[in-house]
Structures are given as structure tokens and as C-alpha cells.
Amino acid sequence: MELVAGCYEQVLFGFAVHPEPKASGDHEKWTPVADFTHHAHTASLSAVAVNSRFVVTGSKDETIHIYDMKKKIDHGALVHHNGTITCLKFYGNRHLISGAEDGLICVWDAKKWECLKSIKAHKGHVTSLSIHPSGKLALSVGTDKTLRTWNLVEGRSAFIKNIKQNAHIVEWSPRGERYVVVILNKIDVYQLDTASVSGTITNGKRISSVTFLSESVLAVAGDEEVVRVFDCDSLVCLSEFKAHENRVKDLFSFETPEHHVIVTASSDGFIKMWKLHEDKKVSPCLLCEVNTNARLTCLGVWLDRATDTRESPPPDAETPPVSKEEPSKSNKKESGDEVQEGERQSKPGTKKCGSTGNGDKPAKGNSLVSAKKRKMVEMLGKKGNSLVTAKKRKMVEMLEKKKRKKKKM
């Protein structure tokens, strides 16, 4: 297991953590060991995502860098966006979805690192996105004061909900029965079956990160040193604890066979691991901490296993979420503050698309160029067939002429 964190200083940190064998129960401790630093970006890191093989980072330099956790090498960069990368989400090990300040949401093949789909998702920035556990839906919010639902099977917009303010976080619950939308210091809890707000949670200060601990329990961090745990049904704060000496920038949670773990990163430079108790009203125990001496911005945990139960697709969702089909024409029908539509696929800008890299494998080419090459190959194949057919026809005609001459003789 490794804790990975990005910072303003353009570096990705990696720390391997191991449980101390003699400690257990409330005295359980883990030991962090510095494993790597990766300086690939030319501006501060803004987002990080992890699957079983790779860590990807987004930056204000408008690129997404890929780091191979197995080989501990740079695997290249994805260069399609024209703006700060604001959010990155893996769906299992096959797909990565990115959002940026250019308003685009891109779906990437996480094997070939090709851009499968590029959608103009918001009129302003894309500020956050979240993938439903089924892999068939995604939610996004942006600076155009909209909450958008995406059909990932067809690669198009399904619904648009107008909200009164710009939201900066959206997150599905583990089973996908509810989701939360964060605006400043308020959390609106939505039910999937009604698509309406069932309640609102208010935090002390602006919220920077949320993570579901269960279907109804949500951990919340903001522009303060405290982490709070809320019940999404009763909207009550179950507990709170001081996690850092400065504001908490990001949260990440996962389960081990023994207990639930929450990881926090702060602008004070510390990454900390906490063991949560079954009774969420009891404050968690600190498992380990490490000081990066940097201003941390984003956080992830690499679990070093083939399947992560929170991110791997269920058996019936193994098909790719989108294919390289033609964009559907816009067909909008407005009803109140909700719109159902088929979204046009955006045309990639003149800047860039696809992957460039210096890993052990050759860098994957521009996905658009690849498509052109495939088309050319198909066209050449067709021409070749037509030439062969013409030759065959000519030979048949010559044979028929010879037969006619023999008959006349």
C-alpha cells in the first residue's frame, strides 16, 4: 500500500506504509517509508487518481501524467485539455475520465491511453465529476451552475439540472442510491430514485473534500483543521476530530479486513492515516503520519491489488462505457430546471490529443491520427480488393474471348 499526494511544488510523493507486527487494537501503528518522488509537471498538481497499476496526476500545466506504480517509471502524458485539470476518476482498470477548466470531459482507454470520447460538458469549468458504481452513469458540476447526468454507455448527456450556485464537489455513495452536491460550506443530499434533495448538511467553513464511509455516513473536510462525520439520513454530525494544524485539503477512505481507514492530507505538509471505529461517534486512532514539507493539494491511495472493490466494475458492467461512435445531434426538451438532451461531441482543439511518453513502451499516438491511419488502411484495403477484382474480370473476359474464337473455328 502506498500513500500518494500532489503539491503546489509540482511533485508527486509516494510513501509505502506497513503495519507494525507487534502493535494491535488501539495500539496499532503503521510505518511510512519514502518510496518515490515524481516531478513531471511544470505547474502545481490539482488532481490525482489511482487504479491497480497506475497513478495519474492532473495539473495547472493542462496535462495528465501517468506513473507506473509497478515499475516506478513515468509512462507518458495525456495532452488533450486546454485548461487546468480539475478532476480525474478511474473506472476499474479500463477507463479514466478527466475534467478540466476548458469545460471538457474526456473518456480515456486506460490500456492504450487513447481518447475515446471528448464532450463539451459545461459552458464554464468542470469542477468535479463522479462515476456511478455501475459504470453506466456519471455526474458532473461546473461553473455554469448546472448539475449534469451523463450516459456513459452511449457517451452523451442525459439530464441537466440547474442549481442556484456553482457547485465544486459531487460524489456518489458506495451503492449509488444517493449522491451529494457541495456548494461552499453546504452539502445537498440527493436521492437517486427521486433526483431531489432529501436534506442539507452545513459545515463550519468551505468544504474542500468529502468521502463516503458507508451508504449513509459521510466524512467532510474543509478550510479548517477539523474532519467531521455526518449521517446523511438524520443530517446530524456524529463526531469530529482535529486532524491537522492547518486546513485539510483532501480525504481518501478505504476498508481493510480489520477496519475502515481514512487518510487526510493538509496544507501543513502532513499525510495522516486514521483507523475508524465501528461506532462513528468515537474519535479515530492515528495509525501513522508523514511530513512532506510541501503544500499538499491532492491525495490518493494505491492499494497494490488487482481489484479494488470500490472501483472495479461488476461482472455485468465489463463492456466499455463508450465507443468511438459519431456524436448524436442535440435534442433538448426543457422542463422546469431539468433538461434531457443528447450532447454533441466536441471537436478537439488544435492543441493536442492522445498520449506522449518515454516509458518502456512506445508512446501511444494521437488518437485522431490513429483513426485517420485506420481509415486510410481500410481505404487501401478496399482499393486493393477492387484491383484484384478488375484483374479477375479481365482474365475472365480473355478466357471468354478465346472460347468464342474456338467455337467459330
Locations of regions flagged by a protein language model:
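Terminal intrinsically disordered, low-complexity extensions flanking WD-repeat/beta-propeller proteins
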Residues: M1, V11, E20-S24, S44, ...
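Beta-propeller domains
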Residues: Y8-T31, K60-E62, I66-K70
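Short coil/turn segments within WD40 beta-propeller repeats
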Residues: E9-F13, A43-S46, D61-H65, I73, ...
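Short loop/turn segments that connect beta-strands within beta-propeller blades
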Residues: H18, M69-K72, A110-W113, L152-G155, ...
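Short C-terminal beta-strands that terminate individual repeats in beta-propeller domains
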Residues: G25-E28, D35-A40, D74-H80, C115-A121, ...
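Loop/turn segments within WD40 beta-propeller blades
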Residues: A47-R53, K71, L88-R94, S98-G99, ...
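Solenoidal tandem-repeat scaffolds enriched in leucines and small polar residues
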Residues: E114-G204
